């Protein structure tokens, strides 16, 4: 807070520096002189710029924050479980993570990296696609033990769970394997992969899901591939997207070096 006397002192100092009267004082208060009005008009733009820059600095919790926006399922199932490992490797670099399917604007939303799910269609941006991602059926060990599944056709008599968000669905996958006679009757339908994965973990049926997103559940033995043979279908569904100038930021380079190593441990590449 600034007192009235302090403001008056600053005005007097400015008027003395300029050698001009900026305010006219009377019993009714203080008003701008003609010179004061002209001066205000000239400097108001600069003052606004200073104000905006000040707010940006104040709102920036820490200049080393790496701001990531992610598709929800990737953020929850792949990135979140590994953030503590990143923190241990780079304790001075902090992360702000937001997850949604909303379209973001890098400058407006102050985002360094956007992890997107979908078809790659951003020609003006840097796009690093995760390679070796594949779609295959998963279920819980309890469901697998209680159902005799010897071949792909046996799936037609099982409880298939549908996920709206996957690029490859049951219809695509079954057609790829030339399976006929499917009536597209799902016992459950979810709009997020993490919901479908959780349903399968609970023994509610069989999902067609990405090995990238289901990987941790498999390693923890909450899920298992339905088939021991390779029946997977390739997909390029997840992408690290960013403006060209963001690629030059040290914190972004650090993150990509780290995430590249993490992905390579699991057989993926960017």
PLM ranges: what are they?
Residues 15-32:
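A short LG(V/I)-centered, amphipathic sequence patch enriched
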Residues 92, 211, 215-220, 229-270:
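C-terminal effector-binding regulatory domain of bacterial HTH transcription factors
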Residues 182-226, 230-233, 264:
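Hydrophobic hinge/microswitch elements
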